[in-house]
Amino acid sequence: LNVHEGPNGLRPKSLYGHEACIVPGMITTDEPGVYVEGSHGIRHENELLCVKHTENEYGTFLKFEPITYVPFDIEGLDLNYLSNHEIASINEYQQYAFDHIKDALTQEEKDWYLNNLFIK
């Protein structure tokens, strides 16, 4: 059983016989993480939808939009290792997720989310 189905995949090195173009409509995962052997690790995973972004004289450009609207658990992050840009990206995603689920939340849940799931 393999939870990762092709043909698309992003790797530092192409696998012979597994080359595939990424096209609009494809869904792929973004799984950044770090593991300390024999100790601990963390990984945040999101599903991303490939969509057309813009077209100009240089070609057609695509982008990825998250389609997983689950906030990251920031308590597992050591903020000392994150740049300001990385913190801003995490907070941007937290807001994106909130905007997609807020109508299903009670006011108490909204308040908790806004007070606990952003890096200050």
Language model region names:
Residues 4-120:
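Charged, cofactor-coupling segments
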Residues 1:
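C-terminal active-site-proximal or functional interface alpha/beta core segments in diverse enzymes
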